């Protein structure tokens, strides 16, 4: 069952567009059970894979930044520059997975009817040098 609402998809789109605007790139949305995006440079060369996570907080109050360990594993499995972008209310926080250090623990969100993976192994990233910030 897919739980993304239209506003979640809009937040995701705004975040990826802000990210690729850094270098005049483009993106391609991947399948619903894959990570979120392939990212291309201005010459249409594949340069990264990106997972976008919604965070309904301002960047200054967003920490620790959560993400499913399974999502990170799938992202790293793509091998080419795995990047996570957290879409906050006032901008994006992003970083290359290989440059980040987080704490793994059981967590997630309150279970929703029809969901089998709301409680799962999560990575929680504290504020650190590997993160970059862009305001909307």
Question: Where do the protein language model's features map onto the residues?
Answer:
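Acidic-basic catalytic patches of nuclease active cores, encompassing PD-(D/E)XK
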Residues: 1-31
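Non-catalytic C-terminal interaction segments of nucleic acid-processing enzymes
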Residues: 3, 21, 40, 87-136
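Structural alpha-beta junctions
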Residues: 21-25, 76-83, 104-105
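A structural signal for short, well-ordered beta-strand segments and their strand-loop junctions
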Residues: 29, 49-51, 83-87
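Generic structural signal for beta-strand residues in well-ordered domains
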Residues: 30, 42-43, 75-77
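Short acidic/glycine-enriched loop/turn segments that link adjacent beta-strands
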Residues: 31-35, 91-92
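Conserved catalytic cores of phosphodiester-cleaving nucleases, focusing on short active-site segments
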Residues: 37-58
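Short, charged, amphipathic alpha-helix that recurs within catalytic cores of restriction-modification
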Residues: 59-88
């Amino acid at each position: 069952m897919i739980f993304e609402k239209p506003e979640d998809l809009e937040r995701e789109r705004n975040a990826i567009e802000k990210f690729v605007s850094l270098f005049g790139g483009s993106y391609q949305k991947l399948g619903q059970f894959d990570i979120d995006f392939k990212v291309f440079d201005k010459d249409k060369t594949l340069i990264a894979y990106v997972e976008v996570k919604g965070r309904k907080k301002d960047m200054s109050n967003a920490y620790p930044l959560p993400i499913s360990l399974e999502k990170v594993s799938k992202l790293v499995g793509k091998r080419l520059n795995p990047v996570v972008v957290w879409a906050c209310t006032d901008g994006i926080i992003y970083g290359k997975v290989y440059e980040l250090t987080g704490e793994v623990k059981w967590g997630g969100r309150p279970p929703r009817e029809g969901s089998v993976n709301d409680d799962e192994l999560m990575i929680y990233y504290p504020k650190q040098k590997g993160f970059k910030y862009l305001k909307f």
